[in-house]
């Protein structure tokens, strides 16, 4: 029975919706012996390192990945060990609360570069025996939480892969439907000596030219792997131009119990040279640097002012409760003592009772409603907030509050303050939802001013333009049904834009900061329009991703090039006339995403001893951290 495209899509859906406790869905089998899956080519390890996979010219963006349905003994052992360790971590996390100090230290450990290169790389050379011993004794190794997400592959022996490839060349139409038979095929293989072929590829281009390919693992970076690269490139023919790429991880996407949706910052550099290939070649000043910023959701590593972000998410929670009253307000885990808050409110009323002590004489001053917000937001429940509001409103009733509020302050509390000065004041009835709404309104007013001032002062962006953008976004959202309070939601894109621009600010040379205002406008436009468009479809915008490309000349190299590139590649193409004959790519990776490749290379990689005197590793030792691979695609001309 031939394999149909619907079978492959059904399997992918079953995997996507599989629960943690559910059994793995039954694989789609070829000849009752090989697993077949449909995978986007951009997700294939090593091959996805191409600067542009569409340049390969394949007739489909999805390929068939064929491997064994049975995991190797080594993979089963590793999976069992990591599951055991994960269970221990879960039990431990339930017993202990993670403090902010630990979270800060963890962030530094992830992103601060040490003399050994920073990050979790030092742990990638642990043997399985040592890892198993560590798991049994429950000893934590620094950096072990930075686990690599391996691509699911169960390779078959290289000899079997060659036989299968030959069989499919002749018999694929008998085993695949017409739609599946057209797709390119990638066979996962393994050898025990270098160079070891990990991918065998075959297919056709969109011009119906036959393509065959292979990815070889050459070992760790040393003289031998350099010689192999040279020999393989010479076999491909002379290339006129070398196209280089280096990918730097500035902030890594690492989830923690307090950071469930982490963000990341990546700098992807590309440049061309006509000189001979040099592994780990440094970029020239003409290199293009693509800055990719993904803020994640609630990732405090991007917070310029943590109190602003903390209060923003709190106000969003208040708006959510107003829209869904069955939900509860989530107050701070460490709230102040209520007696202290009562005393703070008493002191505020006293300060506001003097006519010569009037807050908010200009837009950047703190209003009395801001003062009230900074007290009530520290409560532990809605009842406490209600009592504090009543104390303040009682003072309004007796005309004790002499302070004024700005004309643009549209909160209900601001209108009550104005009414108290015209003898038109009536004490409102404070119930659960009315208290929450009053809190939300003064929180919005406080945050709006702070965000605009912070954005303007830190990044030198016109405050009146920010005010206009914010108001436009709020008006657009207010016309849509089913959205949360537009005054609250409109603060999100502005705040996220501030975090994004602050990241770019750190990468620019001082003399090139003139480009920042235009970049800020692009970010603001992208985030605000994205939020409005999603709101029109009834969706909530939680994806804040921005990319921009700048020449290396504008970049502050010290801000990111003190790190080592996680991925380094060199691509070259050999042509005969107008036709491409071969495409070759040399790749150096610090963290290959194929587990069997890591295991094979690590078995031969020299283990760098940890010296008590903190000796700096040599360049040769640091280079040995890289795994070297070489991919060749051959295009067979039509006869």
From Swiss-Prot:
Major localization listed first in the record, in broad terms: cytoplasm
Keyword Metal-binding attributed: no
Biased composition (Basic and acidic residues): 76-95
Composition-biased stretches (Acidic residues): 96-105
Subcellular localization, as worded in the UniProt entry: Cytoplasm, Cell cortex; Chromosome, Centromere, Kinetochore; Cytoplasm, Cytoskeleton, Spindle
GO biological process, one term: cell division
Keywords: Cell cycle, Cell division, Centromere, Chromosome, Cytoplasm, Cytoskeleton, Developmental protein, Kinetochore, Meiosis, Mitosis
Keyword Cytoplasm: yes
GO cellular component annotations of the record: cell cortex; RZZ complex; spindle
Region ranges (Disordered): 76-116
Function in brief: Essential component of the mitotic checkpoint, which prevents cells from prematurely exiting mitosis. Required for chromosome segregation, the assembly of the dynein-dynactin and mdf-1-mdf-2 complexes onto kinetochores and spindle pole separation. Its function related to the spindle assembly machinery and kinetochore-microtubule attachments likely depends on its association in the mitotic RZZ complex. The RZZ complex recruits the spindly-like protein spdl-1 to kinetochores.
Subunit-level organization: Component of the RZZ complex composed of rod-1, czw-1 and zwl-1. Interacts with the spindly-like protein spdl-1. Interacts with NDC80 complex component ndc-80.
Family label: Belongs to the ZWILCH family.
Protein name, as recorded: Protein zwilch homolog
């Amino acid at each position: 029975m031939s394999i149909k495209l619907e079978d492959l899509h059904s399997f992918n859906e079953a995997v996507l919706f599989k629960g943690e406790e559910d059994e793995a869905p039954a694989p789609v089998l070829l000849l009752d012996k090989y697993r077949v899956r449909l995978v986007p080519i951009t997700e294939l390890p090593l091959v996805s390192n191409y600067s542009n996979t569409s340049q390969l010219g394949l007739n489909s963006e999805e390929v068939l990945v064929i491997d064994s349905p049975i995991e190797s003994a080594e993979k089963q052992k590793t999976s069992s060990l990591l599951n055991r360790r994960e269970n221990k971590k879960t039990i431990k996390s339930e017993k202990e609360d993670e403090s902010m100090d630990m979270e800060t230290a963890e962030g530094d450990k992830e992103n601060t570069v040490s003399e050994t290169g920073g990050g979790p790389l030092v742990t990638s050379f642990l043997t399985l025996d040592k890892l198993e011993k560590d798991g049994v004794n429950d000893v934590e190794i620094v950096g072990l939480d930075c686990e690599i997400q391996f691509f699911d592959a169960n390779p078959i022996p290289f000899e079997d892969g060659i036989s299968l490839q030959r069989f499919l060349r002749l018999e694929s139409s008998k085993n695949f439907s017409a739609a599946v038979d057209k797709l390119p095929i990638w066979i996962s293989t393994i050898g025990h000596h270098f160079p070891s072929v990990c991918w065998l590829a075959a297919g056709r281009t969109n011009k119906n030219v036959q393509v065959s390919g292979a990815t070889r693992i050459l070992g760790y970076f040393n003289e031998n792997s350099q010689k192999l690269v040279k020999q393989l490139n010479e076999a491909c023919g002379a290339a006129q131009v070398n196209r280089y790429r280096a990918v730097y991880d500035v902030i890594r996407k690492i989830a923690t119990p307090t950071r469930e949706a982490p963000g990341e910052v990546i700098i992807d550099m590309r440049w061309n040279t006509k000189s001979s290939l040099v592994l780990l070649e440094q970029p020239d000043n003409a290199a293009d640097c693509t800055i990719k910023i993904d803020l994640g959701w609630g990732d405090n590593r991007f917070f310029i002012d943590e109190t602003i972000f903390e209060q923003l998410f709190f106000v969003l929670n208040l708006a959510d409760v107003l829209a869904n009253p069955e939900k509860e307000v989530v107050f701070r885990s460490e709230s102040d003592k209520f007696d202290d808050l009562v005393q703070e409110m008493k002191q505020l009323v006293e300060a506001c009772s003097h006519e010569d002590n009037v807050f908010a004489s200009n837009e950047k001053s703190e209003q009395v409603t801001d003062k009230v917000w900074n007290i009530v937001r520290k409560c532990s429940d809605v009842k406490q907030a209600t009592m504090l509001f009543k104390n303040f409103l009682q003072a309004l009733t007796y005309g004790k509050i002499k302070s004024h509020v700005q004309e643009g302050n549209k909160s209900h509390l601001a209108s009550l303050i104005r009414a108290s000065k015209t003898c038109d004041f009536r004490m409102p009835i404070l119930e659960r939802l009315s208290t929450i709404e009053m809190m939300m309104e003064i929180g919005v007013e406080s945050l709006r001013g702070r965000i605009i001032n912070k954005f303007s002062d830190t990044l030198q962006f016109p405050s009146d333009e920010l005010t206009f953008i914010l108001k436009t976004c709020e008006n657009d959202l207010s016309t849509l049904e089913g959205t949360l309070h537009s005054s609250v939601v409109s603060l999100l894109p502005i705040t996220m834009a501030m975090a994004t621009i602050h990241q770019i600010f750190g990468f620019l040379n001082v003399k090139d900061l003139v480009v920042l205002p235009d970049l800020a406008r692009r970010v603001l436009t992208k985030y605000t329009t994205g939020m409005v468009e999603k709101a029109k479809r009834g969706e909530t915008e939680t994806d804040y991703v921005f990319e921009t490309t700048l020449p290396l000349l504008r970049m502050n190299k010290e801000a990111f090039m003190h790190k080592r590139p996680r991925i380094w590649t060199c691509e070259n193409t050999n042509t005969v006339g107008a036709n491409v004959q071969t495409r070759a790519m040399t790749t150096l990776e610090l963290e290959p995403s194929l587990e069997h490749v890591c295991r094979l290379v690590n078995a031969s990689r020299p283990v760098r001893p940890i010296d008590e005197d903190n000796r700096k590793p040599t360049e040769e030792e640091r280079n040995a951290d890289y795994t070297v691979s070489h991919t060749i695609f051959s295009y067979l001309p039509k006869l």
